[in-house]
Each structure stands twice: as C-alpha cells, then as structure tokens.
Amino acid sequence: MKEFKCELHIVGGALTGLLTAYCASQLNYKIIISEKKKIISNQKKAISDKRTTAIAEGSKVFLESQGLWQYIKEFAEPIHNIKVIDKTAKSKLFFSNPKENSNLGYIVKNSKLIEVLIRLLKKKKNISIIEGAGISSINSNNSKILSFSKNEKISSDMIIAADGKNSAVRKILGTNVFKKHYREKALVINFYHEKPHKNIAYEFFFKTGPLAILPMQKNKNNFQSALIWSNNPQSVDMIASTELQKKYVTEILNEKIQQYLGRITNINSIQTFPLSAHINEKFYHDRAVYIGDAAHSIHPIAGQGWNLGLRDIKSLMNMLKRSKNTKTQIGSIKFCKAYNDLCFYDAYRLFEITDKLDWIFKNDQHYLKFVKKLGFNIIEKNKTLKNQIVNFAMGI
C-alpha cells in the first residue's frame, strides 16, 4: 500500500474540489486531491459536461482576488438584465445592476471552468493528484486524519470533502443529512436561436415548474443560450427520449420562448437530472469539513447553487490564511466548528428560501395568484427593495 502525507486532503476532483485546491495552493499548503474517477487525466470526459454555471458578481470578485478571473473571463458571457415572468399570475419583473456599466452575473460552461483549473493545477508543485482512489475508510486522532482506499493511505491534517451530493466521506463519517426530493427533473438544453439574447436572462414560472434561459457566448455567428426547465419526471423523460427528440423539443420550446429569442434554429445538447436538495446536520466532523454539494444542495430556481458553494470556499480560505499567519492548528475541533458557524446558517437560509419559492410559484391556488401579483407590483415599484433583491442575487 502506498503512503502519502499532506496538510490538506481534498476528496473530489470535480469543479468544487479543483477550485478549492487552487485557492489553497495560493496559501502554500501541501495538498493532495483524490478522485475515484479519472476526470483530471481524462480531459475529454471533463469537457463533455454540457452544463453551465451562473457566476454571481460577488463570486466573480472572489475569483478575481484569487487571480483566476483573468483566465475565465474570455469564456464568460455577462448577464446585463434579468426578466422574471410569472405565467400563472400574469406578472413581470425586470432587474438590472443599479451601478452603471455593471453586470448581474456571468454564464460559463462547466467544461471551460474545469479546463482552466486543470491547466493551472498541473503547474502547481504543492499539489499531488491521485485518481481512481475511492475512499473506503477514515480514522482520526488528535493530530492527523488517515484515509484509506484500495491501494493508498493518505495522512493529512484535515480532509476537505468536496465529493458531491452523494458524498462518500459523509457516509463513512456518519454525518446526518436532511434530503428533499422534488419529484421533478431538470431538462438542460443548449440551443441556437434566431435573435440575439442581448445579455438578458429569463426566468419563467409555469404551473408545471420554472424555466430559465441563460445567455451564452456566440458560437461563430450563431446566437446561443442555455435552458433549464423543471418539470414532472414523466414529461421530461418523454421529451428527452422521443425518437424525434430535437424536432419535438424545438416545437415545444418555440411555443414558450419564440417571442423573446426568435425561433430555435438548432438543439446542441439535451441532458436530464433529477431535482433534489439536501443539507447536512453540520458541515464538519473530526478533522474534516464539507464544502459545496457535499454539504448542501438547493433547488435551482434562483441559480445560486454553485455560488453558495463558492462562499464555503471563500470562508474556508480566510480561515486557512489566518491559521497560516497565526500558526494555529488546522483541522482541530475549534477550527472545524468555526467553519461550520460561518457557513451553515447561510446555506440553511438559502435552502429554505429556494424551497419556499418553488412551492409558491408552482402553486396555482387563487389566493396565491393574488399574493404573487401583488408582490410583483410592490417589488417593481419599490426601487430600494428591488436593489436589495439584486444585491442578494449578486452575492454582495
């Protein structure tokens, strides 16, 4: 069995794990990334992810502070405005950044983010990557935490669990988790359309569920957007599995969005994902902390899932930086509890907000239609309230 030693053992080599490793490497920690799949060496697999990530303005500021935005910005399509249209209550809202010449956020392909991070991580001398290493057991004592896979033993000061919704670390350590299954699936489509999107993001609320359209970069001379549509599993499966898939999807979507973007000219990709949310009872264990989807996931209705995970990373980096400067012990119970206190309630609040928003906008009861219409009118006319919502969406 091979033995490895490091200060930080990051379990999970997807987007959150890679970003955490890069940021921690800037603080000169010795790091090991372990990943059960061969995502990093097999870049073809990494770039096959057709999904997009919405990066809020506040998240962009953090990425700038880490020296990362300079590599990402060429792939990022800005969001200038957001239009919210509730089809059940026939109400509309229009949001823009109150600061002149500023954006609300950016849309970037996951594959581009991963590509950039892998390229930068390969240049780091204080990062080692172990692939094909699924964690099978974990033991800890007062000063170290040991993790074991089939062929490796890794000794570290702290484990950072970034291994997603179905975290193996969480399961092994026995951290309790609350799960919410929405009995919905998300239909994720990248498509080309006739008219320019003018950097406007749309959020439609239908009785069946929300539909978001996000502006993407032009591909050559083709206008392109990403669509995320939450619907019941039967409808999503029927749309995604039909033999005349692209033609059928095009017909359905043209009915809903043609007046905004013109006709759909081509469907680039179609993917489906079951919708669920979860939150851990706590975001730490003995010498281990959970970040991103290993700690929490939320309904995509507000497009804030990845930004919430990035706030975990930001909080953890501030603590690691402080520990480096004061020479305090990382991974101690005091350290891990302090991280939990910084991140848990922020995540719990957003978990509850997105869950309630989903319920409100899916509910077709008459009194709720009235409440939604009234709420939309109040927000549209109240500049202060509108700006507060914009700041929340931007993560500032």
Q: Language-model segments: which ranges?
A:
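C-terminal helical "tail/cap" subdomain of flavin- and related membrane-associated enzymes
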Residues: N318-I396
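Glycine-rich FAD pyrophosphate-binding loop
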Residues: H9-V11, S25-R51
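Short FAD-binding loop at a beta-strand-to-alpha-helix junction that anchors the flavin cofactor
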Residues: K282-I301
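Conserved N-terminal helical subregion
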Residues: E3-F4, V61-S65, F75-I172, K180-K185
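Central beta-strand plus flanking loop segment that forms part of the substrate or channel wall
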Residues: G58, N166-A201, N231-S235
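Beta1/beta-strand and adjacent pyrophosphate-binding region of the FAD-binding site
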Residues: M1-T16, I32
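N-terminal glycine-rich dinucleotide-binding loop that anchors FAD/FMN and/or NAD(P) in oxidoreductases
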Residues: I47-E74
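Conserved FAD/dinucleotide-binding core of flavoprotein oxidoreductases
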Residues: K207-F273
